[in-house]
């Protein structure tokens, strides 16, 4: 690995030399090689510990959108090999619940203090049956919407969206206005779309959470160093961005993201684990420091079978990456 890094650096120096002779500016990579190697090591460690067949981690500088580290790994014949296609591989993710929650808050018809009955963790909506992760243990019963996100209650989020929107198309338009591309191939129901059962690229979810960390400003993710490219100066009302920031912090301090919490730095984020046709994914996306966000980090693992925990698996690696950054990239 290190030989490849040094060779790449050597080639870059040669290219820069030729460029200097021709008075042409060479794009400078945003990737921090030291951090890239650290993230690679932590991701491999997690894959071994959790028995994952795929792993991915993305580190973004919040204010600029500069990609500081990008690692994609998959198992191949008993070995872990790099796979950069994972970054743009659209798939289902329960991280999308946060986007649906923000879209619901934007209508003014719901708030984080509203109460929702999640019953015994099972709810029949039209032809769909929605399960909360703890339905076998009797569910959560009544929850505030703040608690609903903290406990990853699909029922609470679905009810909030249903209360906020009567028109599916208006809901989808709002998501697009917030920078989340529409999955035109999705054939399922509105509730399932809101929960994240459609396909979306990991980088799109990173952009969304980075915008929350950035006070509502969405910037382009980029691998070549330059000034921030603003996609949208404000993806939602300020008060609703602040509500989401509160909810994502609460997820870590009081919800299913406690294993992402660090004694070194205050973090915020959310997780999700979801069954797909090709495996079970454990995702976590968040940012830090909470007081003035500098980095947004996405971590994902894929396992062929249960148990899988977004907070317990991806969340722990998120914490380790955050602490490594605080030690070396202040």
For each of these PLM feature ranges, what is it?
Residues 9-17:
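Bacterial N-terminal signal peptides
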Residues 220-221, 225-330:
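Conserved SxxK-family serine transpeptidase/carboxypeptidase catalytic domain
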Residues 16-26:
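Bacterial Sec-dependent signal peptides at the C-terminal "C-region" and cleavage site
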């Amino acid at each position: 690995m290190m030989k490849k890094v040094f060779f790449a650096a050597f080639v870059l120096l040669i290219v820069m030399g030729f460029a200097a002779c021709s008075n042409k500016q060479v794009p400078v990579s945003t990737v921090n090689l030291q951090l890239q190697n650290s993230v690679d090591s932590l991701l491999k460690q997690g894959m071994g510990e959790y028995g994952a067949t795929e792993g991915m981690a993305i580190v973004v500088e919040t204010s600029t959108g500069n990609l500081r580290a990008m690692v994609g790994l998959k198992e191949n014949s008993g070995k872990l090999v790099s796979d950069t296609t994972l970054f743009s591989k659209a798939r289902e993710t329960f991280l999308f619940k946060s986007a649906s929650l923000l879209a619901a808050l934007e209508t003014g018809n719901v708030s984080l203090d509203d109460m929702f009955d999640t019953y015994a963790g099972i709810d029949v909506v039209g032809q769909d049956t929605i399960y909360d992760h703890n339905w076998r243990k009797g569910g959560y019963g009544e929850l505030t919407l703040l608690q609903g996100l903290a406990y990853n209650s699909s029922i609470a989020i679905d009810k909030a969206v249903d209360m906020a929107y009567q028109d599916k198309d208006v809901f989808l338009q709002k998501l697009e206005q917030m920078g989340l591309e529409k999955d035109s191939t999705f054939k399922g129901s509105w509730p399932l779309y809101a929960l994240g059962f459609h396909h979306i690229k990991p980088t799109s979810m990173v952009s969304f959470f980075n915008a929350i960390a950035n006070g509502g400003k969405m910037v382009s993710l980029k691998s070549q160093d330059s000034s921030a490219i603003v996609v949208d100066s404000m993806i939602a009302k300020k008060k609703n961005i602040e509500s989401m920031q509160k909810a994502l912090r609460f997820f870590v301090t009081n919800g299913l993201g406690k294993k992402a919490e660090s004694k070194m730095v205050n973090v915020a984020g959310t997780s999700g684990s979801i069954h797909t046709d090709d495996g079970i994914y454990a995702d976590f996306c968040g940012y830090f420091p909470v007081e003035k966000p500098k980095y947004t980090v996405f971590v994902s693992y894929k396992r062929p079978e249960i148990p899988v925990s977004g907070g317990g698996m991806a969340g722990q690696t998120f914490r380790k990456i955050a602490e490594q950054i605080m030690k070396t990239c202040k």
